[in-house]
A protein has these predicted regions:
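ABC ATP-binding cassette signature C-motif
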Residues: 1-255, 305, 311-382
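Intracellular alpha-helical coupling/juxtamembrane segments of multi-pass membrane proteins
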Residues: 247-272, 276, 285-301
Length: 382
């Protein structure tokens, strides 16, 4: 059963065609990934599907009465409420039912009308079916999985960092448990263990979802079908990401072969026409000219652009390029309790890892001289 049908979708951005006459469907059992190079229109497609922008041409049709949940990482958060209170808003309709239930009991206490108890019983059954009394357990599961519980449930949402804020919005969306999840880069700001948890969660998700992610390892773990955007077309592949990429490469090789064969045929036909247009075979030449005019010419294949980055290298006689001594970093207060004492030698390649908010960027800014150390010092080789 198709939850979403996209027909003849066309979209341009300034003078660039993102897609032209694209077609695909999202079925009930689909865990769909969206792939393609930067700038091909993945996020634009998500905005079209969620109604944030209107497509130039074509039809985007969702099944009626479908709850589609979209990850809006820039949603506004109201100051003055804690993390848990915010997450409870995912169940606002159930809390409203609980209020109706309590009001019925109050009225029954006032007039003893048995019909009120009957209404209350129906609401009670509804709440139990919706697992209302397990809400705290559900919140704990998601908040712990995404690393929000460690921040403290009473933490004011207005005081969260950008990454923590994105986690909170994602957590609420998951708790709402929509029929379809639409996620654009959900792993942004997530640490490795949180990505692992999210992958497990999505694999167990009973609904359908569409996910855009630059993390192909994550995408490969959660998807059972792929739509790939490439040079104005949207192609759907069944199976996981590895299968889709293999099939895409096979399709590309077939296209290159077909294009080369057609070009050879065109050149051969054009040569025949030039040679025989004015001679005894002019009738045959004109016939081939008409055939050539009616030919469906294949679009020239385009090569994917590859980045070429050059980091200027300055040779140095020193074996020690960086030395820190009891270096403490932070803004108003230290981000890391222990002082840094480390060195970087000539030729070493160093990775800086750690949880979000632990101080990785702050360390780099300090070493670049953009922030002053709270304590200690460091020395760079001249």
């Amino acid at each position: 059963m198709s939850l979403l049908t996209v027909k003849n979708l066309s979209q341009t951005f300034i003078d660039k065609t993102l897609y032209e006459d694209a077609n695909f469907v999202l079925n009930k059992e689909d865990h769909m990934g969206v792939t393609g190079q930067n700038g091909v229109g993945k996020s634009t497609l998500i905005k079209i599907l969620t109604g944030e922008i209107t497509q130039d041409e074509g039809e985007v049709k969702w099944q009626n009465k479908l709850h589609v949940g979209y990850l809006d990482q820039y949603a506004k958060l109201k100051a003055g409420i804690g993390i848990k209170e915010f997450l409870q808003t995912a169940f606002s309709d159930l809390f409203q039912k609980e209020k109706e239930l309590n009001d019925l009991y109050v009225k029954y206490g006032e007039n003893g009308d048995d019909s009120l108890l009957e209404k209350a019983g129906k609401i009670q059954t509804f709440l139990e079916e919706k697992e209302f009394y397990d809400i705290d357990t559900k919140i704990d599961r998601v908040a712990t999985g995404l690393g929000l519980a460690d921040l403290g449930y009473e933490r004011d949402v207005a005081k969260l960092s950008g990454g923590q804020r994105s986690k909170l919005i994602l957590a609420k969306l998951l708790l709402q448990n929509p029929d379809v999840l639409v996620l654009d880069e959900p792993t942004n700001y997530l640490d490795v263990n949180h990505i692992d948890w999210l992958a497990d969660y999505l694999n167990d998700f009973e609904g359908a979802f569409i996910v855009v992610s630059h993390d192909y390892d994550f995408l490969g773990r959660i998807t059972n079908c792929i739509i790939d955007i490439d040079f104005g077309t949207i192609t759907r592949y069944s199976g996981d990401l590895k299968h889709a990429l293999r099939q895409k490469e096979a399709d590309r090789e077939s296209y290159l072969k077909a294009y080369a064969n057609q070009q050879r045929k065109i050149k051969k036909t054009e040569a025949y026409i030039r040679k025989n247009k004015a001679g005894s075979r002019s009738k045959s030449a004109k016939s081939r000219e008409k055939q050539l005019a009616k030919m469906d010419i294949l679009t020239p294949p385009q090569n994917n652009k590859k980045a070429h980055v050059v980091f200027p290298y300055v040779d140095t006689a020193s074996n020690l390029l960086l030395q820190t001594q009891d270096l403490v970093i932070g803004y108003d207060q230290a981000l890391v309790k222990s002082a840094f004492n480390f060195s970087v030698g000539n030729g070493e390649k160093v990775a800086v890892t750690g949880f979000n908010g632990i101080g990785k960027t702050t360390l780099l800014k300090t070493l670049l001289g953009k922030l002053k150390p709270i304590y200690g010092n460091f020395e760079l080789s001249s």
